[in-house]
């Protein structure tokens, strides 16, 4: 997320619906459907950015993007929802900094809980390395 999130962990509970300005864009609106996003900080990069782990209680279209934008912390690279393009350019990002490291769901046929994991793709690993170089951890 762009900027420094104040809390180490929090929940965003805000309804999401279609934005009137676009067929593709969504926003927090009282007329929207319920949406709940839980998050934990995994790494901080000064006030420039914050790496978070997200757990969705609901699955609305663009939920992560809309919820973080609504609290003033859009995803890096997500200009549709207010990200400053300078950080993306600095990191060489050509997309939103969004990746599912782990998904858990009940298999539709077997009904068994299934977990799928994935590493960060190369472009996000490079961006993460650049952020760590720009913001070394303090001992």
Across the structure, where does each feature detected by a protein language model lie?
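RNA pseudouridine synthases
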Residues: 1-139
């Amino acid at each position: 997320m762009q900027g420094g999130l104040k809390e180490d962990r929090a929940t965003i509970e805000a309804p999401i619906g279609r934005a009137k300005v676009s067929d593709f864009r969504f926003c927090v609106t009282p007329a929207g459907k319920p949406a709940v996003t839980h998050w934990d900080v995994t790494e901080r990069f000064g006030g420039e950015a914050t790496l978070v782990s997200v757990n969705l209680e609901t699955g609305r279209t663009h939920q992560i993007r809309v919820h973080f934008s609504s609290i003033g912390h859009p995803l890096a690279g997500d200009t549709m929802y207010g990200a400053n393009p300078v950080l993306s350019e600095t990191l060489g990002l050509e997309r939103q900094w969004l990746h599912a490291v782990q998904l858990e769901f009940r298999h539709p046929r077997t009904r068994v809980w299934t977990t799928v994991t994935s590493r960060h793709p190369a472009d996000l690993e490079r961006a993460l390395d650049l952020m760590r170089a720009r913001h070394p951890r303090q001992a």
